[in-house]
Amino acid sequence: DEHCIFLNQEDRCGIHKIRPGFCRLFPLGRLYEDRSFKYILQTKECVKTDRQKIKVRKWLDIPELDQYEKFVNDWHYFLKDVAASLKKENASDGTIKQINIYVLKEFYMRGFGEEVSFYAQFEQRLKEVKAVLLK
């Protein structure tokens, strides 16, 4: 039996109690095109054969799914835009390192408060960082 040992009774990832986005998504994936994305079913990555139909929204079970999807999309294309800008400018390794550190500090080290929604704070921060990096 090739049953995934990490699936719980509901056949969902049981590795992490809050099921991070990547775990919630599996066995789905995202196909990014034209500044958007769509969900795809990864059939070769999951050995389970008796799959049942379920709506993506129900499978993901993420509060405020529309805002979450906007966040995922904005973040993905922000990173792509920064990478393209650095390539176009033929940025040095030192410049790339400085920008990576700046992005890490702004989005991972600088906290997000609880008084305002994460998504609103992220959007504001993304706008500020884009103004600096993508002039």
Regions found by a protein language model. Name each.
Residues 1-3, 7-135:
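Short loop/turn segments that flank or connect secondary-structure elements
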